């Protein structure tokens, strides 16, 4: 008996093609959704990602010109100095690129950290780089083992609380080694060794500044022993004329800007620049003052502009960033504006020299 020939069912074939087509469309939709979702996630990550570290050379260039601020008072007796978000915005508008927080208090509460982080966030939102500096006055006055450990513990706690902050936030271990510790080089270097080792446990690549003995003068840089855990993310802070020039003190004399007076400034900068080249440790000037505001205010604004103009030119010449000392000398926090008489002075330092 002859077998029947197979019958081709066109309708079944058409239905099969249709189902296959629909399946591919659905798969494409799913893939499209996954792709869009992945791109959105990646875009958000790129937009919000922070670099894991900033090299000292790059950080030095980022700092440019800044100002020391007393938002946390001037001693352990008072944690509250003049501060406002409006002031931060005014600073940024003036061309200021970084601020140094000078902290004096050994006991930081959760509320204190909340306030500190709020100030840091406001700075970051306005493109101001925050530098956290510790005064450690009791240690400087009496640098014994007990005070040594208190400073190390302070930085341990600060580092733990700041470990997730942007790498733009840096640590300045001691504001001007003065009093007894200014001559105790071995103790100061020992403190730096211990503080850096402690900080590195939670902040392996955050920029840390160490300051030389002898009131942070550049001549003291040669006495610094670089901490073993510096690991390439260590810088040095030095300064001169932190309380302004003087018309009588030969060490920081400035009258009319004579060749001899200018040479004093050039000599100090050269000492720091030579040390920087020799050690490959980049530096920053943490404080200089255009006038002797704390010691009689003996300079006219015109004289201050002449001094500030030369200082700025010389530091700019070698790419050394700096902070002027200090905020409330130039900014009126009650009126929320720069003190009018210093407008040209500030422009000389922060704007005109950058143009």
Locate predicted features.
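Positively charged n-region of N-terminal signal peptides that target proteins for export
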Residues: 2-3, 28-34
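Bacterial N-terminal signal peptides
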Residues: 37-44
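N-terminal carbohydrate-binding accessory modules
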Residues: 50-98
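Acidic/histidine-rich helix-loop elements
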Residues: 67-83, 103-107, 144-146, 245-264, ...
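Aromatic-lined substrate-binding rim segments of carbohydrate-active enzymes
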Residues: 85-138, 149-153, 157, 191, ...
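Active-site region of glycoside hydrolase catalytic domains
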Residues: 152, 156-291, 310, 317-323
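Aromatic-rich peripheral "rim/lid" segments of glycoside hydrolase catalytic domains that contact
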Residues: 296-355
């Amino acid at each position: 008996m002859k077998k029947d020939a197979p019958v081709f069912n066109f309708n079944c074939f058409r239905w099969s093609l249709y189902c296959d087509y629909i399946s591919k469309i659905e798969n494409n939709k799913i893939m499209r959704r996954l792709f869009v979702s992945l791109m959105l996630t990646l875009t958000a990550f790129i937009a919000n990602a922070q670099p894991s570290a900033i090299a000292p050379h790059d950080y030095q260039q980022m700092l440019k010109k800044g100002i020391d601020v007393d938002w946390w008072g001037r001693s352990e007796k008072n944690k509250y100095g003049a501060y406002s978000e409006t002031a931060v915005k005014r600073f940024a508008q003036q061309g200021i690129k970084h601020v140094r927080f000078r902290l004096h208090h050994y006991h930081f509460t959760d509320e204190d950290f909340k306030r500190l982080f709020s100030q840091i966030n406001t700075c970051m939102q306005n493109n101001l780089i925050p530098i956290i500096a510790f005064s450690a006055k009791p240690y400087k006055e009496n640098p014994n083992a007990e005070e040594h450990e208190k400073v190390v513990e302070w930085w341990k706690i600060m580092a733990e609380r700041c470990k997730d902050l942007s790498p733009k936030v840096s640590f300045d271990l001691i504001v001007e080694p003065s009093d007894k510790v200014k001559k105790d080089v071995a103790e100061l270097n020992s403190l730096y060794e211990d503080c850096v080792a402690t900080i590195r446990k939670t902040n392996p690549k955050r920029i840390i500044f160490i300051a030389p003995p002898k009131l942070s003068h550049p001549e003291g840089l040669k006495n610094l022993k670089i901490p073993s855990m510096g690991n390439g993310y260590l810088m040095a802070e030095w300064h001169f004329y932190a309380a302004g020039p003087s018309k009588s003190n030969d060490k920081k004399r400035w009258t009319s800007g004579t060749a001899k007076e200018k040479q004093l400034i050039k000599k100090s900068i050269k000492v720091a620049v030579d040390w920087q080249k020799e050690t490959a440790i980049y530096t920053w000037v943490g404080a200089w003052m255009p006038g002797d505001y704390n010691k009689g205010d003996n300079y006219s604004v015109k004289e201050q502009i002449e001094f500030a103009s030369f200082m700025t030119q010389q530091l700019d010449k070698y790419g050394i960033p700096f902070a002027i000392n200090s905020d409330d000398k130039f900014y009126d926090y009650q009126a929320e504006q720069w003190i009018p008489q210093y407008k040209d002075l500030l422009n000389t330092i922060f704007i005109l020299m950058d143009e």
